[in-house]
Amino acid sequence: MTERVQVGGIQIAKNLYDFVNNEAIPGTGIEADKFWAEFDKIVNELAPRNRELLLKRDEIQEKMDTWNREHKGQKLDMAEYKAFLKDIGYLVDEPADFKISTSNVDPEIATMAGPQLVVPVMNARFALNAANARWGSLYDALYGTDAISEENGAEKGRGYNPVRGAKVIEWARNLLDGSAPLASGSHKDAAKYYIDGGKLAVKLQNGDVTGLKDESGFVGYTGAADAPTGVLLVKNGMHFEIQIDASHPIGKDDGAHVKDVLMESALTTIMDCEDSVAAVDADDKVVAYKNWLGLMKGDLEESFEKGGQMMTRRMNGDRTYTGADGSELTLKGRSLLFVRNVGHLMTNPAILLKDGSEIPEGLMDGLVTSLIAIHDLKGDGKFQNSTKGSVYIVKPKQHGPEEVAFTNEFFGRVEDALGLPRFTLKVGIMDEERRTTVNLKACIHAAKERTVFINTGFLDRTGDEIHTSMELGPFIRKGPMKQAAWINAYEQWNVDIGLEAGLSGVAQIGKGMWAMPDLMAGMLEAKIGHPKAGANTAWVPSPTAATLHATHYHQVNVFDVQKELANRQRASLDDILTVPVMEDPSSLSAEDIQQELDNNAQGILGYVVRWIDQGVGCSKVPDINDVGLMEDRATLRISSQLLTNWLYHGICSEEQIMETMKRMAAVVDKQNAGDAAYRNMAPNFDDSIAFQAAVDLVLKGREQPAGYTEPLLHAYRQKAKAKYGQ
């Protein structure tokens, strides 16, 4: 039984109450009694409004279901469909043209373009790795991944392979030639780098001395001018440092004693309290909030054993250089941090309201994470996150402008409660629900003084696409879905609306995750498409991926791209509204159907078993072909909703689903054989809470609000914690 403290009209789990009073509040200048009194007032006043917004979702969905049932199997008459959507309040009138007026935005968001990490804030080690991923070794990123082929003797092996090393160095020199070309010759022929009269001089192997073709690309250096240990360059706002050390194992054999190229990598990181964590009660929420506090104060540490030695990870300090003009230059050593709160749907037993109901978790997140961020705003921590006095909060899974307006109002209430200037709290709007996509301009307008990013998310957005139009017919397979007309239009529309609303130079226009952390060669080839599409940030699955993706922003000046795109015709709303149902379900072979069932069932089970049994909300889960995929609740939503849809429309039977689930459970068990903490699902399926959760996500998928997986996951995780004593 949870021990609780009664404060006014709320009952707070004692461990959360103690954490806030004894750890979060000291140093903020806020009085604990006043904080809880304001907290009580805000949540008890706004919780009913929160519930009303959720009821409106249900009412709209019921009307959609009825209309879709009546039009099943018919070709959509787009004029009729849009009139219906307007009639039920799904599609609202677009506001007149406007530009966002967000102020005090850090340059990493407003005027720079580069990779973004998303990490579970409950994992301190991951959080620290991400915070420190502002800078990364290009040599390590290339050597340790498939970005460099293992062909022709370039295998990774156990020790250092000089053949592979040579390929890494060649790749890096090519990057230097592209990002910092010399007036004559190539970086491959460099014999010495030095500073002469505030400019970079490069002595070549043939004795010639040259410099940069564009001298403004030289920013600063470390060490002595005539023998620098580091040369700092910049391309399209992204810094990179040629590191020189003749005594280093790599540097000693290099023509110019270059040991590495250090890349400015993850400009921003989202510390996630949402889709990548499993936080179902006060114990879990305290872990999340405590790590966020450590990040805001700069004192988060994590000790762990590696190779038989204890190591302690901490946040990196800033980087200091001598500038080209001789003055001291300091660059941030850490990624700029956002925090992602949960959306409007879930409640949490950590706090009970005056009517005994659980608190809307998003209200709790907003109040507590903002309180904690005061440590950064006051500048009394070890490091500064925002140099502009802002707090960056990502708000996911909002449906339409009314819900964004509610967030905007709530943030204002939080600012007043904490004594913060208006619009200190900035908002990142995830464009991952269909009603937000089609009303994106109105959504941005509802928070036009706070918006610092919009971001597309293919997986959640597809999950909502399926659930919204569940009754219309069976949906196409997950693979072809990525090429469907609506997705391309959705991705373009997000950029078009963002540019119309004046986000360029003020806020981020973001793109989604590369979900295959082991396939970096593929990422290097494909993900340049994101900056080319006008996105000034895009999600990557690891610090290594951030370093490699950073090279794309050297090749593409995103702000130039945005200027060009600002004049193109906006993407078609009709395309976005085109529902990707199958034209001819009978064309699917039995083999096609089973393959899709196997693939989705395996992904569902592989993710759910770790979520339920171990409380792991984000992990690299091997797919059916043993390719490691980064999975979070978004991937689970699309997989479960697709199977729900196929079952509902008779593409497959419940018996088929169960047979597939049981067979795939054995596959997942085998894939996890090396994990000592793992609990097998097969063959005692009735005893496996995780297996039951996975099955329910499919069999009860139509009943889940918007196809979200959280209600079932939370319920089953709480069961597992009770059963296993976690």
UniProtKB/Swiss-Prot annotation:
Pathway: Carbohydrate metabolism; glyoxylate cycle; (S)-malate from isocitrate: step 2/2. Glyoxylate binds at R340, E432, G457, F458, L459, D460. The active site is at R340, D632. Its main location: cytoplasm. Its EC number is 2.3.3.9. The modification Cysteine sulfenic acid (-SOH) is found at C618. Its cofactor is Mg(2+). CDD domains: malate_synt_G. Gene3D superfamilies: Malate synthase, domain 3, Malate synthase, domain III. It comes from the Bacteria. Acetyl-CoA binds at V118, R125, F126, S276, R313, P541. It catalyses: glyoxylate + acetyl-CoA + H2O = (S)-malate + CoA + H(+). SUPFAM superfamilies: Malate synthase G. Keywords: Cytoplasm, Glyoxylate bypass, Magnesium, Metal-binding, Oxidation, Transferase, Tricarboxylic acid cycle. Mg(2+) binds at E432, D460. It is found in: Cytoplasm. One of its GO terms (biological process) is tricarboxylic acid cycle. One of its GO terms (cellular component) is cytosol. One of its GO terms (molecular function) is magnesium ion binding. Belongs to the malate synthase family. GlcB subfamily. Monomer. Involved in the glycolate utilization. Catalyzes the condensation and subsequent hydrolysis of acetyl-coenzyme A (acetyl-CoA) and glyoxylate to form malate and CoA. This is Malate synthase G. It comes from Marinobacter nauticus (strain ATCC 700491 / DSM 11845 / VT8).
